[in-house]
Amino acid sequence: MSKLWSPIVAALKPYVPGEQPRMADLVKLNTNESPYGPSEKALGAIRAAADTDLRLYPDPVALGLRQAIAARHQVSVGEVFVGNGSDEVLAHTFAALLKHDRPLLFPDISYSFYTTYAGLFGIEAVEVPLDAAFRIDIADYRRPSGAVILPNPNAPTGIGLPLAEIERLVADHPGQPVVIDEAYIDFGGESAIALVPKYDNLLVVQTFSKSRALAGLRVGFAIGQRPLIEALERVKDSFNSYPLGRAAQAGATAAIEDEAWFEATRGKIIASRAKLTSELEKRGFEVLPSQANFVFARHPGHAGQTLAAKLRERAVIVRHFAKPRIADFLRITIGTDAECAKLVAALDEVL
């Protein structure tokens, strides 16, 4: 702490990102990255962009990328906003749309950046508890509020809500922004983007980090009706007019246009998720039903922190959260079948 800090800084509780360890022969299953490399078309576009005139600034409105996203999701270009990862898109969303006289609502077990952003932007927030089965109950959000944000599927649980439930939530909050964070939607959920034409209060946020395997490029986007997108643009242009470099725009555009690669890799991840769930359950784990590229599991005979440490000793890294109700759970990214087999073998040594 320093006397030179602005008053808000001392009160901040920064987000703690997943570890990026540098270990030989590591099975890295802790940050929900894709186990497969990006689309070859995306890699080719990135290389080509690196050969262009990098002394010039990139397109500040990322028109080509927004056109590709709009075409993929059958919306207009003016209904698409892009940013430097979905985290930046979410940050602009908090600043532009979520501060009101009544509190912002989000789940108590969820993406912890929501709490961080609420603190950063001075937003009053109420954390709504998950039910006994670790599910989001839409009825619990029928309370005084100024806005709502929740992930679907939720993280770290992986449990998704059907589109009908999401529509109920949006319809229950007319005149209030409802933000659906769909970082993991491509692994089994049904996107709320289809509801955007019907609801002027709905904003849907997605990322290229998971199903498009571009976590290292940092590209995210939001889709909503034009007034919501305009609010995000006003915040962006008051913060950083050039959030996406040439390589990011080119790579993401090629990635979203490569439908064959997308379907093949997400299909493999979904199949591997089913296999890993079965193997964990055979060994006594409780595994929550996942629609994400990870599973959330606990063993009745072993503390989560202890299991995570023993796996680490065997060069297998998973994510543990030392938080109430979920301290015995491990969040395990779906790797390749070979990586999942190494995880299972390590578990057989420690259980």
From Swiss-Prot:
Record's keyword terms, sorted: Amino-acid biosynthesis, Aminotransferase, Histidine biosynthesis, Pyridoxal phosphate, Transferase
Pathway named in the protein's UniProt entry: Amino-acid biosynthesis; L-histidine biosynthesis; L-histidine from 5-phospho-alpha-D-ribose 1-diphosphate: step 7/9
EC code: 2.6.1.9
This protein's record includes keyword Metal-binding: no
Keyword match Lipoprotein: no
Entry cofactors: pyridoxal 5'-phosphate
InterPro entries referenced in this protein's UniProt entry, alphabetically: Aminotrans_II_pyridoxalP_BS (IPR001917), Aminotransferase_I/II_large (IPR004839), HisP_aminotrans (IPR005861), HistidinolP_aminotransfase (IPR050106), PyrdxlP-dep_Trfase (IPR015424), PyrdxlP-dep_Trfase_major (IPR015421), PyrdxlP-dep_Trfase_small (IPR015422)
Pfam families to which the protein is assigned, alphabetical: Aminotran_1_2
Single GO MF descriptor: histidinol-phosphate transaminase activity
Modified residues (N6-(pyridoxal phosphate)lysine): K210
Superkingdom, taxonomy of origin: Bacteria
Single GO biological process annotation from the record: L-histidine biosynthetic process
Catalytic function, reaction form: L-histidinol phosphate + 2-oxoglutarate = 3-(imidazol-4-yl)-2-oxopropyl phosphate + L-glutamate
Subunit (UniProt): Homodimer.
Family of the protein in this entry: Belongs to the class-II pyridoxal-phosphate-dependent aminotransferase family. Histidinol-phosphate aminotransferase subfamily.
Name of the protein in question: Histidinol-phosphate aminotransferase 2
Gene source species: Rhizobium meliloti (strain 1021) (Ensifer meliloti)
